[in-house]
């Protein structure tokens, strides 16, 4: 059964509601049958070589936190079959979209987790990831909720621990305040370097970027996206 209350959470409450529209029968079946085969088992200590997590042989491992409907993650894992991907999404309807996509086009280089991403970060070995993507995270607009934003000193410490030197942390948002917040936090953190040289480095989408449903909605409503890339020193 799907636990919509989802009692397991890590140190921070970084996401809001977990469930939207009721799932269709096929989607519920995918949660019962497909997700257990792809979900990381955090009760088992992580291997020092994360490549062993995947059915396909991979050279490096990347992580996407809060993949929404999975448009980018499914696209990227197909585009780079030599890389392993860990995707985390606590929102049940987003995970349902990803499972439906994987049911049609499987990715042997992809593993999933449907709870708090900080639990995965704390489970991973040191210097084990080649990249972390955080695209359009919940901005938590109200000041009293800013502490829930995923970009924080504590989570940047987590990123710094699990990222290899030279690895990328990529962040995209259409919320100017959150963009500035992320720039301030990353630029004052000793482990990260922002190497932008011109406005194109943050105004232009990432190479090969497929776009997302959320981004398309933001563009229709007149908002623009900013794409930041930080390098692990």
Swiss-Prot record:
Stored InterPro entries: SAM-dependent_MTases_sf, tRNA_(Gua-N-7)_MeTrfase_Trmb, tRNA_methyltr_TrmB_bact
Binding locations of substrate: 142, 174, 212-215
Pathway it works in: tRNA modification; N(7)-methylguanine-tRNA biosynthesis
Enzyme class: transferase
Keywords, ordered alphabetically: Methyltransferase, S-adenosyl-L-methionine, Transferase, tRNA processing
Positions bound to S-adenosyl-L-methionine: 64, 89, 116, 138
Listed PROSITE patterns: SAM_MT_TRMB
Cellular component GO terms held in the UniProt record: tRNA methyltransferase complex
Pfam family, one: Methyltransf_4
Active site: 138
Disulphide bonds in the chain: none
Enzyme nomenclature, EC number: 2.1.1.33
Known catalytic reactions: guanosine(46) in tRNA + S-adenosyl-L-methionine = N(7)-methylguanosine(46) in tRNA + S-adenosyl-L-homocysteine
Alphabetized GO MF terms: tRNA (guanine(46)-N7)-methyltransferase activity
Assigned protein family: Belongs to the class I-like SAM-binding methyltransferase superfamily. TrmB family.
Physiological role: Catalyzes the formation of N(7)-methylguanine at position 46 (m7G46) in tRNA.
UniProt protein name: tRNA (guanine-N(7)-)-methyltransferase
Gene: trmB
């Amino acid at each position: 059964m799907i636990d919509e209350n989802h009692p397991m959470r890590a140190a921070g409450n970084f996401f809001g509601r977990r469930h939207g529209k009721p799932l269709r029968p096929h989607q519920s079946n995918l949660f019962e049958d497909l997700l257990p085969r792809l979900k990381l088992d955090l009760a088992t200590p992580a291997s020092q070589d994360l490549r062993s997590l995947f059915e396909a042989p991979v050279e490096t491992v990347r992580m996407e936190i809060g993949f929404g409907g999975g448009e980018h993650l499914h696209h990227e894992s197909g585009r780079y079959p030599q890389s392993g991907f860990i995707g985390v999404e606590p929102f049940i309807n987003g995970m349902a979209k990803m499972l439906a996509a994987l049911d049609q086009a499987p990715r042997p280089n992809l593993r999933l987790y449907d709870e708090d991403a900080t639990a995965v970060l704390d489970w991973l070995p040191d210097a084990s990831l080649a990249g972390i993507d955080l695209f359009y995270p919940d901005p938590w607009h109200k000041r009293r909720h800013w502490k829930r934003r995923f970009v924080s000193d504590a989570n940047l410490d987590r990123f710094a621990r699990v990222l290899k030197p030279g690895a990328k942390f990529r962040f995209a948002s259409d919320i100017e305040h959150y963009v500035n917040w992320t720039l301030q936090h990353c630029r004052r953190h000793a482990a990260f370097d922002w190497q932008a040289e011109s406005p194109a480095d943050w105004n232009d989408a990432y190479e090969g970027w497929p776009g997302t449903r959320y981004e398309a909605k933001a563009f229709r409503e007149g908002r623009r996206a900013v794409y930041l890339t930080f390098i692990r020193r």
